[in-house]
C-alpha cells in the first residue's frame, strides 16, 4: 500500500440515529486522502475494516457500540451448508452472468424491491441517479452479477466490486416475490465467480448479530470476522 494506515487522515461524522439498531446512534470514520482511491489501497483498507459508498471510504466508529463487525468468506475454503446445497439444487434452472453494465430493464426490478422491502429505508423512493451515486466509483472495477430464470427473465442483480485478490458483495436487489432466497443465491453465485477467477476473499460488509436481517451472512463457512483488528474464524 502506498500510504501508511497509521498516517491517513480521518474525518468523523456527527452522531446520528443508527440505521440498524433502534435507540442507538452511529458515527463513521471517513478516509479523507484521495490517494487512497486505488484498487490496491482499497484491498488493504477492506482488510482493515473499511468499506465504500460511492467514492467515500468509511468504517463504523461509534462511541458506545461495536456491533458492526467486518465479515468475509475464505473462498478456497468455502463449503456450502446442507440448506445452501438444497437451495442450489432448487435453483439449478437459474443462471448468472457478470456484466460491466446493468441490463436496460434493471430499474423496474430495483423499484419493486425497494417498494416492497425497504420502503422505510434511505433508498426510498427509488431513483436512478441516487443508485448511481451509491454504487458507482471512478477508481474501482464494479461488476453486475445478473441472475436469470430459464426464460432469461431478470430476477436479481448483485453489485460486486472486483479486485485482484478479492471481491466485495456491495449491494443486491431482487424480485421480492420469487419463492427462492435470491439474496443467498446471489452470494453463492458471487462465490462461484470468485472461485472461477481465483479470488482469495469475498467480503460481505458488516455483520450485526442483533440485526436478524443480517444473520444470513454467518451461514457461509468458513467466514472470518474482524474483531479488535484481528481476523478471527
From Swiss-Prot:
Would you say which domain of life the source belongs to?
A: Bacteria
Provide the species name.
Answer: Vibrio campbellii (strain ATCC BAA-1116)
Top-level EC class as recorded in UniProt: transferase
A GO-annotated cellular component: cytoplasm
Recorded protein name is Aspartate/glutamate leucyltransferase
UniProt lists the gene as: bpt
Q: Give the family from UniProt.
A: Belongs to the R-transferase family. Bpt subfamily.
PANTHER family assigned to the protein according to its UniProt record, in alphabetical order: ARGININE-TRNA-PROTEIN TRANSFERASE 1, ARGINYL-TRNA--PROTEIN TRANSFERASE 1
Main localization is cytoplasm
List localization entries: Cytoplasm
Query: Which Gene Ontology BP annotations are present?
Result: ubiquitin-dependent protein catabolic process via the N-end rule pathway
Q: What is the annotated role of this protein in its UniProt record? A: Functions in the N-end rule pathway of protein degradation where it conjugates Leu from its aminoacyl-tRNA to the N-termini of proteins containing an N-terminal aspartate or glutamate.
Q: Report the EC number(s), separated by commas if there are several.
A: 2.3.2.29
What are this entry's molecular-function GO terms? arginyl-tRNA--protein transferase activity; leucyl-tRNA--protein transferase activity
**Keywords on this record?**
Acyltransferase, Cytoplasm, Transferase
- Asked if the keyword Transferase belongs to this entry, the reply reads yes
A Pfam family hit: ATE_C
Q: What is the lineage of its organism?
A: Bacteria, Pseudomonadati, Pseudomonadota, Gammaproteobacteria, Vibrionales
Record field: catalytic activity = N-terminal L-glutamyl-[protein] + L-leucyl-tRNA(Leu) = N-terminal L-leucyl-L-glutamyl-[protein] + tRNA(Leu) + H(+); N-terminal L-aspartyl-[protein] + L-leucyl-tRNA(Leu) = N-terminal L-leucyl-L-aspartyl-[protein] + tRNA(Leu) + H(+)
Which SUPFAM superfamilies does the annotation name? Acyl-CoA N-acyltransferases (Nat)
